[in-house]
Amino acid sequence: MTTFLSLTTAAAVLTLARGSNALVRPGNVGKLPALGWNSWNAFGCDIDAAKIMTAANEVVNLGLKDLGYEYINIDDCWSVKSGRDASTQRMVPDPEKFPDGISGLADQIHDLGLKVGIYSSAGLTTCAGYPASLGYEDIDAQTFAEWGIDYLKYDNCGVPSNWTDAYTYCVPDPGSKSTNGTCPDNKNPAPAGYDWRTSLTAERYRRMRDALVSVDRTILYSLCNWGQADVNDWGNETGNSWRTTGDITPSWPRIAAIANENSFLMNYVDFWGYPDPDMLEVGNGNLTLAENRAHFALWAAMKSPLIIGTALDSISQDHLAILSNKILLKFHQDPVVGRPAHPYKWGYNPDWTFDPAHPAEYWSGASSVLGGTLVLMLNSEDTKQRRTAVWKEIPELKDVLGRQGKRRTGFRVTDVWTGKDLGCVRDHYSVELESHDVAALVVGRAC
């Protein structure tokens, strides 16, 4: 029998269930993975109110709001760098970057029917050296609530020595080729059975959770501690999503390495809790169109938060089409099925191989809204390759095939990228893929 511990305030309920710990918020905030935009990948520290409002307006004008994208998130470098207000101890928005303050900007974003996010860190300074929130959790949570903030990205920089963990957790990032990943150079591992919930890292993040729960506004809580301190074990009871790796970059080797690492964490994904492989790089750098497609499809299939990180006023139609794929977004936002797609076959490698250059290539996931099963086939290699989805290998299709017997071995198939009905496909579907491209299918009713 599942037991629950509830901490109730006017703003939120913290529900802890054995075996399925989750931070449950009012209004279903955080039940589904977040959709939005963030300033960092596009602009870094070079931000101001005009750039944030441009992004907000483009989310509306480009039709992204209608597809569910709702958060407009201000990342690092938004405050006065020299320190807090001496009398109130509050962080102060940079008046040159944000002449109407964060609250004035938030009002404008809310007027568009969107939500607004902000950034801080569980340390003394942010990653760019601005004031952060360790020791000021209650003041900052109250300030964010008063400003109308709806989302907090909480980083892991500026941690003082007295808040450093006693042990070092193994995050094989980028890792080396080995089964499940190892950290052979870790000189300070925790003893067997160590509970990372007791770590100082977990405590730093709990303090902000408790502060956010206590304010009279529901603020989605996005942990960004890079997979440290076994956050997969306690992240769901602390926040709505939690970063699993270091930062992403707009390069295929980095995207592949993160996809590989995150692919081993799919059992942690369900309603109210999402391992986060970092923000999207679609539209950035020198990624090929195929790599942009594969990046987005994998992130959507894993039900990761989909936070756009490119300048929307200059986005190409090809990149916009990827971010706007209705089939992948429907799978991602399924109101009935919380579980993600899972790898069912590694393809290039033997199953369960940890290989940053070649993540799992064959994925499938159930859906209540697509009329079938989502299936992905990735070409992780550097040359054109053929990939084949065999129906009897796909977990969601095995029972159907068993009931049909030998009389019917086909399924109606739809191409996710084109929306084209591919007809009744018997036994398997085979396709030639460019380097680092992905085929995405909805495998529907038997035929």
Swiss-Prot record:
Disulfide partners: 45-77, 127-157
GO cellular component: extracellular region
Compartments, record wording: Secreted
Keywords on record: Disulfide bond, Glycoprotein, Glycosidase, Hydrolase, Secreted, Signal
Entry GO MF terms: alpha-galactosidase activity
A Pfam match: Melibiase_2
Chain residues that bind substrate: 225-229
GO biological process entries: carbohydrate metabolic process
InterPro entries given in the database record: Aldolase_TIM (IPR013785), Glyco_hydro_27 (IPR002241), Glyco_hydro_27/36_CS (IPR000111), Glyco_hydro_b (IPR013780), Glycoside_hydrolase_SF (IPR017853), Melibiase_C (IPR041233)
Segment forming the signal sequence: 1-22
Highest taxon of source: Eukaryota
Family recorded in the similarity comment: Belongs to the glycosyl hydrolase 27 family.
Free-text function comment from the UniProt entry: Hydrolyzes a variety of simple alpha-D-galactoside as well as more complex molecules such as oligosaccharides and polysaccharides.
Protein name: Probable alpha-galactosidase B
